[in-house]
Amino acid sequence: MPAQKIDGKLIAQQVRQHVKSHVESIVSSGKRPPGLAVVLVGSDAASHVYVTNKRRACEEVGFVSKSYDLPSTTSQQKLLELIDTLNADEEIDGILVQLPLPAGLDKEQVLERILPHKDVDGFHPYNIGRLAQRIPALRPCTPKGIMTLIESTKRPIKGLDAVIVGASNIVGRPMFMELLLAGCTVTSCHKFTKDLQSHVERADLIVVAVGISAFIPGEWIKPGAIVIDVGINRQTDGTLIGDVDYATAEKRAGWITPVPGGVGPMTVASLIENTLEAYVKYHSN
């Protein structure tokens, strides 16, 4: 029996609709809507697409979206000064600096300059630390979205053997903490892991985020497992495929995310959720 497809597009639309309804209630009570500032430095084509999607999502739910498109020659100091200005702006609840930044700019310093309660990407060390201490505040967007996808399966995950392939700061590491918080027994696999196959084959739940086309053979997937494929890899013919061999994995898994239309839409939906949360928890008074 083929796996049930986890429809990220549908679930993301449901999240956005929920946020939109909340914003309409806020505005009808006479309060200002939430505000998100999006900062883009340089002319990276993929970044422009991502930023456009984020701005469109903001407008759809009724946020005020402010855009700051800066040239690739922008200095570190000018970028930090802009963040300081946005930190002080009482009508801005979230600040998003689109990554990657052009060469010569210090990403860590930039991200740490954003006030933790305006860090709607969830990358600030304070927010990562809160997640590690089991008291999450603003959570990293992609792992948060993945948890929403997993919850949609209705399968209890407490006690499951969960395996994460990939240990990036954006997905793998915070994903480990999310699944640990949810009660899974979690294994983190990375480029130094020996016998990756044995880890994957025992996983009741697997999250793959390495950016390599069909890196995980479908034959490795445990029957009935939940498979979350974070990879988005463009092929020479223009098609997009994930990090898991979908055609074979789909025949073995219990649930699986497609590529595209799985994890990707949830990252933006989680950003929208975080912006509303920042407004409600930290700025609405």
From Swiss-Prot:
Entry's EC annotation: 1.5.1.5, 3.5.4.9
GO process annotations (BP): L-histidine biosynthetic process; methionine biosynthetic process; purine nucleotide biosynthetic process; tetrahydrofolate interconversion
Keyword Ribonucleoprotein: no
Binding site for NADP(+): G166, A167, S168, I232
Domain of life the protein comes from: Bacteria
Keywords: Amino-acid biosynthesis, Histidine biosynthesis, Hydrolase, Methionine biosynthesis, Multifunctional enzyme, NADP, One-carbon metabolism, Oxidoreductase, Purine biosynthesis
Known pathway: One-carbon metabolism; tetrahydrofolate interconversion
Reaction(s) the record says it catalyses: (6R)-5,10-methylene-5,6,7,8-tetrahydrofolate + NADP(+) = (6R)-5,10-methenyltetrahydrofolate + NADPH; (6R)-5,10-methenyltetrahydrofolate + H2O = (6R)-10-formyltetrahydrofolate + H(+)
Disulfide cysteine pairs (residue numbers): none
An example Gene Ontology CC term for this record: cytosol
Keyword presence, NADP: yes
Gene Ontology MF: a single term: methylenetetrahydrofolate dehydrogenase (NADP+) activity
Biological role: Catalyzes the oxidation of 5,10-methylenetetrahydrofolate to 5,10-methenyltetrahydrofolate and then the hydrolysis of 5,10-methenyltetrahydrofolate to 10-formyltetrahydrofolate.
Family to which the UniProt record says this protein belongs: Belongs to the tetrahydrofolate dehydrogenase/cyclohydrolase family.
HAMAP family according to UniProt: THF_DHG_CYH
Self-association and partners: Homodimer.
Name of the protein this chain belongs to: Bifunctional protein FolD
Gene: folD
